[in-house]
């Protein structure tokens, strides 16, 4: 038979060093009876207590002793309602710790509620006067700042412009056409191109007497230029006279063009009656015939001056069209 080893019996010193849990008799009227009974039952289910459990109980006892005096008053509160006082020395350390933790949590909740109420009142008082500034800040933040990528680049602006909600085209009546003086209005307003030419010819014939008035004004200007001694005033009068003379020449040139076209149309109408095909003058042909008639009515010296003036004008245009001359060794 194999030898069976037995455990050695614990010595007296080991027995004395072992920590023993204090026992107490729970009162039936106490409210904490359930919690005190549950604590040993749970601990007894474990079989035995380790050293860590005893250390935790000692820490709870130290916390209880170092707690504020208000906690003792709170712990005695149930005794006042229950009628019978509870001896704290008879309660377990775990039950006292749980009771103390529950009371501390209640105090914290009350403090938080009071702080939140005070804070909300202060926030409302602070926010009331500053709501305008907050709105203005929000509006400024929405405004987009347009920047240029380069100082020479154009500013980039958004195309997302809001359309106005007002629609005035239904409320406002259309403007009625105003009466115009044909002397100052352009010919053929609201008509076709052919109609405008006819209206211009009619207006020119109807208001041909204005040419006589303009001739008188030009004579008065020439007299005023001779009499005035102020250089600035004399220059202004000369400009006015020059503009009137240029307008007179332009009107005379247009009148000649119309006469030339009207004569050509009359001849073509007679030829069409004879059964011939019509021939329409080009603008280049019209200019040639106008130049021939213009030189025919001028003297030889005037013709030479006009030809020289025209030659210089054409030479100047050709010179501008030429590229710039390059520098050569002789120019250096």
UniProtKB/Swiss-Prot annotation:
Keywords: Coiled coil, Nucleus, Ribonucleoprotein, Ribosome biogenesis, rRNA processing. It comes from the Eukaryota. Residues 128-142, 165-183, 315-332 have a biased composition (Basic and acidic residues). Residues 212-274 form a coiled coil. One of its GO terms (biological process) is maturation of SSU-rRNA from tricistronic rRNA transcript (SSU-rRNA, 5.8S rRNA, LSU-rRNA). Residues 1-91, 104-196, 243-262, 312-332 are annotated as: Disordered. GO terms for cellular component: 90S preribosome; nucleolus. The keyword Nucleus applies. InterPro entries: RRP36 (IPR009292). Its main location: nucleus. Pfam families: RRP36. Residues 27-45, 53-77, 117-127 have a biased composition (Acidic residues). It is found in: Nucleus, Nucleolus. Component of the 90S pre-ribosome involved in the maturation of rRNAs. Required for early cleavages of the pre-RNAs in the 40S ribosomal subunit maturation pathway. Associates with 90S and pre-40S pre-ribosomal particles. Belongs to the RRP36 family. This is rRNA biogenesis protein rrp-36. It comes from Neurospora crassa (strain ATCC 24698 / 74-OR23-1A / CBS 708.71 / DSM 1257 / FGSC 987). The gene is rrp-36.
């Amino acid at each position: 038979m194999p030898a069976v080893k037995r455990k050695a019996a614990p010595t007296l010193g080991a027995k004395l060093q072992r920590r023993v849990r204090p026992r107490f008799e729970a009162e039936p009227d106490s409210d904490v009876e359930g919690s005190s009974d549950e604590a040993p039952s749970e601990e007894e289910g474990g079989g035995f207590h380790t050293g860590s459990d005893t250390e935790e109980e000692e820490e709870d006892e130290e916390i209880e002793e170092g707690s504020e005096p208000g906690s003792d008053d709170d712990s005695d509160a149930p005794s006042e309602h229950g009628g019978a006082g509870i001896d704290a020395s008879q309660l377990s350390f775990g039950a006292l710790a749980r009771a103390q933790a529950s009371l501390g949590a209640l105090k914290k909740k009350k403090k938080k509620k009071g702080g939140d109420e005070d804070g909300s009142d202060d926030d409302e008082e602070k926010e009331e006067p500053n709501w305008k500034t907050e709105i203005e800040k929000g509006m400024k933040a929405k405004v987009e700042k347009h920047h240029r990528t380069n100082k020479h680049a154009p500013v980039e602006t958004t195309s997302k412009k809001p359309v106005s909600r007002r629609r005035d085209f239904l409320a406002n009546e259309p403007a009625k056409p105003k009466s115009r003086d044909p002397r100052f209005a352009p010919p053929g307003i609201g008509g076709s191109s052919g109609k405008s030419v006819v209206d211009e010819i009619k207006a020119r014939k109807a208001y041909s007497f204005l040419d006589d008035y303009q001739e008188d004004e030009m004579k008065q200007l020439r007299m005023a230029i001779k009499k005035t001694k102020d250089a600035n005033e004399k220059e202004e009068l000369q400009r006015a006279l020059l503009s009137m003379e240029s307008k007179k020449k332009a009107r005379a040139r247009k009148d000649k063009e119309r006469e030339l076209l009207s004569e050509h149309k009359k001849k073509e109408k007679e030829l069409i009656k004879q059964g011939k095909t019509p021939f329409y003058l080009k603008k280049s042909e019209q200019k040639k015939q106008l130049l021939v008639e213009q030189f025919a009515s001028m003297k030889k010296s005037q013709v030479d001056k006009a030809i020289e003036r025209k030659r210089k004008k054409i030479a100047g245009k050709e010179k501008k069209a030429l590229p710039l001359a390059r520098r050569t060794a002789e120019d250096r």
